[in-house]
Amino acid sequence: MTFSVDKVRADFPVLSREVNGLPLAYLDSAASAQKPSQVIDAEAEFYRHGYAAVHRGIHTLSAQATEKMENVRKRASLFINARSAEELVFVRGTTEGINLVANSWGNSNVRAGDNIIISQMEHHANIVPWQMLCARVGAELRVIPLNPDGTLQLETLPTLFDEKTRLLAITHVSNVLGTENPLAEMITLAHQHGAKVLVDGAQAVMHHPVDVQALDCDFYVFSGHKLYGPTGIGILYVKEALLQEMPPWEGGGSMIATVSLSEGTTWTKAPWRFEAGTPNTGGIIGLGAALEYVSALGLNSIAEYEQNLMHYALSQLESVPDLTLYGQQNRLGVIAFNLGKHHAYDVGSFLDNYGIAVRTGHHCAMPLMAYYNVPAMCRASLAMYNTHEEVERLVTGLQRIHRLLG
C-alpha cells in the first residue's frame, strides 16, 4: 500500500484546527503524538458500551473487558516480536517501566560495589532511577561520553565494563539528537561481560520496526502516547526467565495468589504480579487501536516517508542564518537547534505565533544540555502526519525571526 500523508492527516482531528489564526503545524510529536480518530473512538466506545473492571468478574462485561485487555497484550507482543505475550507488562509509560526494573530486578541483583552503565544522552527517566538505585545500595553509575556530533564514544565502552557491571541502560534513539544507537554491538558486548541490557525505546517504536528477539535485549520499554495512543499506558518487555524471577514492586489487588494475616501473601505469576490494582483498561484499549493503526499503515512505509521528510528538512534548514543544529545528519524523528544567541523559549514563542508547535527547554536531558553548554534548545519533531509544507513554514518562520531579532 502506498503511503498517503493526506489520508493519514484526515484521521487526526486536531490537525484541522488553527492556532493564532493559522493552520496548526504540530512539530512536537516526540513529546507526545496526536491521536487518530480510530484511537479516540476505540477508547470512547469502550467507556460507552463495554466498560467493566477486569479480572475475576464472571459477568459478560467483565469477561469481555478482560479478553480485550489480554488481546492488546498479544497484539503488543507481535508488534515488537516478543516470544510470548506473557513477557509484556502494562505500565503507565516508559518512566514507570524503568522504575519497575530498577525497584524489582535492580533491588534484587545490584549490590554495593557493582556498577551500572548509562550514556550522556539519556532522558532523565533513564538516569534518575539508576542514580536512586545506586545511592540505595552503594553501586557506581558509569557514563558513556558523547562525541560533538551527538554519537556515543563507543571506543570507551569496553573500558567501562568489568566483572561488577550488572546493567547497561541505553536509549534506542535520543529524544534530543535523534541519534540511533548501535544496539546490536552494545548488547553483545554487555552480554559478554555478563550484564543485562535495558533499552529505552520511547523514541524508536513509532519510526521503524522493533524486534526484541533480534536485539536480544533483556528489557525494552516504550510509551503509548508517543505512538499515537493514549496517555498513561505503556509496555515493559522482559525476557520470560528474568520476569519470572523478579519480585513485585507494588502490592495490592490483582497481583496476589493468596493473602493471609497469619501466613502472609503469595504472588500470582508474571506478568500479572506487576500489575497491582485496577488497570488503565481504557488506555489499554486505545493502545491496541494505535498499534493496529500503525501496523495497518506499515512501519516500513512510515519509516521511508519520515526519512525523506527528514532529509528535506535538514537541507532546507541550511538556508537559515545563524542556526545551530545539534546531532548528526543521520537521525530519526527530531531536530534540535538554537537560533543565534536567542533563548529557545523566545524562538519557540515566535514560532507559536506563526501556528508552529515546537518543544523548548532542556527536554529532560540536562546532562546533554551541559555537554553542549546551552541552557535549552528548540526541538522540532517529524511524524508520519507532517508535511513538506510544514517544514517550509518552519524554515520561513525561523528566517523571519532572524530578521526581526538579528
Swiss-Prot record:
Alphabetized Pfam families for the sequence: Aminotran_5 (PF00266)
Pathway membership, UniProt: Cofactor biosynthesis; iron-sulfur cluster biosynthesis
Main location as per UniProt: cytoplasm
CDD domains linked to this entry: SufS_like
E.C. code: 2.8.1.7, 4.4.1.16
Cysteines paired by S-S bonds: none
Cofactor(s) named in the record: pyridoxal 5'-phosphate
Residues carrying N6-(pyridoxal phosphate)lysine: K226
GO BP, one annotated term: cysteine metabolic process
GO CC aspect terms: cytoplasm
GO MF annotation, one: pyridoxal phosphate binding
Subcellular location: Cytoplasm
Keyword annotations of the record: Cytoplasm, Lyase, Pyridoxal phosphate, Transferase
Catalytic activity annotation: (sulfur carrier)-H + L-cysteine = (sulfur carrier)-SH + L-alanine; L-selenocysteine + AH2 = hydrogenselenide + L-alanine + A + H(+)
Family as reported in the entry's similarity comment: Belongs to the class-V pyridoxal-phosphate-dependent aminotransferase family. Csd subfamily.
Subunit details: Homodimer. Interacts with SufE and the SufBCD complex composed of SufB, SufC and SufD. The interaction with SufE is required to mediate the direct transfer of the sulfur atom from the S-sulfanylcysteine.
Function in brief: Cysteine desulfurases mobilize the sulfur from L-cysteine to yield L-alanine, an essential step in sulfur metabolism for biosynthesis of a variety of sulfur-containing biomolecules. Component of the suf operon, which is activated and required under specific conditions such as oxidative stress and iron limitation. Acts as a potent selenocysteine lyase in vitro, that mobilizes selenium from L-selenocysteine. Selenocysteine lyase activity is however unsure in vivo.
Protein name (Swiss-Prot/TrEMBL): Cysteine desulfurase
Organism expressing this protein natively: Shigella flexneri
